[in-house]
UniProtKB/Swiss-Prot annotation:
InterPro entries noted in UniProt: Chalcone/stilbene_synt_C, Chalcone/stilbene_synt_N, Chalcone/stilbene_synthase_AS, Polyketide_synthase_type-III, Thiolase-like
Protein's UniProt keywords contain Transferase: yes
Protein's UniProt name: Chalcone synthase H3
Lineage, highest ranks first: Eukaryota, Viridiplantae, Streptophyta, Embryophyta, Tracheophyta
Active site: C164
Keyword entries, A-Z: Acyltransferase, Cytoplasm, Flavonoid biosynthesis, Transferase
Keyword Transmembrane helix among record annotations: no
Length: 389
């Protein structure tokens, strides 16, 4: 007769959870930031709001974003005029779009990740799906399972309405699944579509306007598992530890509310200040056990909520400008894609490292940090270990 301890030991993996593949996808519709203010005020019938348009232009100019991808085209918006108003009942129209498009875009990214992984999809044991775009039952995790033709017995977890920190959350959850289930291969998908938050401008709700200047659509997928099969699976990053915390005195700093008018977005001005003031505490808690206190010795993946957050974090920690290169690159090329952003940055970093002939996936360095920031204010901190190229 076996003991519970023996069963438990046999169930656990030996090594750390490891990212084995990354795939990304965006809608085909690409929007240049320099042209967006004119387009946005025209499509929302707001061209008479000239002062507000000037404000929005300045927001877009300062955003450090070059282009974004969006499912919402001019044609779709013309067919759904309520989406273009500031506060018109439009939840049904938004939901009808995202319940179809979120899993569909997720499938595109997942297909790329599975292809890179190189193993049959029947070996996927778990699915973790995350989106802040819409809610449905059965969820986007179920739809993705069907779209990909995964086994009906695949173990699914659906995370709705988490917000921008959730790229860190999915890594934390996938790490626990991979390390506590021997042989587990977890498909992680973050898929975000701004059709839930798009709305016309309003003079009294400038934080909504900030969202219109920053948010973009995108989907990213990872395969995560422990004990990679030599010669068959290629490790990219190891997940060493993961933590989540709520920042002090940050109630109401970032809120989102699902209403008849869609998902409304509320932002306190001092979000960059709150994050930069508290970030070192998270770093010390994560890296003190490893004997690391030089933040420039790490490679960096930070959720690019907006340029002000990155600037203040950089300044507060005296980071060298190149530390946030991959993060700023993704913000510039895609905008803020909520939970998917940090996964895009992982992909950008490993791609650039291979291209530049660096010795590890982490910009030639051994240890790295991944940060997710979002509603709460909630901060996710993931310690990464790079892999030799």
């Amino acid at each position: 007769m076996v003991t519970v301890e023996e069963v438990r030991k046999a169930q656990r993996a030996e090594g750390p959870a490891t990212i084995l593949a990354i795939g990304t996808a965006t809608p085909a519709n690409c929007i240049l930031q320099s042209e967006y203010p004119d387009y946005y005020f025209r499509i929302t019938n707001s061209e008479h709001k000239t002062e507000l348009k000037e404000k929005f232009k300045r927001m877009c100019d300062k955003s450090m974003i070059r282009k974004r991808y969006m499912h919402l085209t001019e044609e779709i918006l013309k067919e759904n005029p309520n989406l273009c108003a500031y506060e018109a009942p439009s939840l049904d129209a938004r939901q009808d779009m995202v319940v179809v498009e979120v899993p569909k875009l997720g499938k595109e990214a997942a297909t790329k990740a599975i292809k890179e992984w190189g193993q049959p999809k029947s070996k996927i044991t778990h699915v973790v799906f995350c989106t802040t775009s819409g809610v449905d039952m059965p969820g986007a995790d179920y739809q993705l399972t069907k779209l990909l033709g995964l086994r009906p017995s695949v173990k699914r977890l659906m995370m709705y309405q988490q917000g921008c920190f959730a790229g860190g959350t999915v890594l934390r959850v996938a790490k626990d699944l991979a390390e506590n289930n021997k042989g587990a291969r977890v498909l992680v998908v973050c898929s975000e579509i701004t059709a839930v938050t798009f709305r016309g401008p309003n003079d009294t709700h400038l934080d909504s306007l900030v969202g219109q200047a920053l948010f973009g659509d995108g989907s990213a997928a990872l395969i995560i598992g422990a004990d990679p099969i030599p010669e068959i699976e290629k490790p990219i990053f190891e997940l060493v530890s993961a933590a989540q915390t709520i920042l002090p005195d940050s109630d109401g700093a970032i809120d989102g509310h699902l209403r008849e008018v869609g998902l409304t977005f509320h932002l306190l001005k001092d979000v960059p200040g709150l994050i930069s003031k508290n970030i070192e505490k998270s770093l010390v808690e994560a890296f003190k056990p490893l004997g690391i206190s030089d933040w420039n010795s790490l490679f960096w993946i930070a959720h690019p909520g907006g340029p002000a957050i990155l600037d203040q974090v950089e300044s507060k920690l005296a980071l060298k400008p190149e530390k946030l290169r991959a993060t700023r690159h993704v913000l510039g090329e895609y905008g803020n894609m909520s939970s998917a952003c940090v996964l895009f940055i992982l992909d950008e970093m490993r791609r650039k490292c291979a291209e530049d002939g660096l010795k590890t996936t982490g910009e030639g360095l051994e240890w790295g940090v991944l940060f997710g920031f979002g509603p709460g204010l909630t901060v996710e901190t993931v310690v990464l270990h790079s892999v030799g190229i």
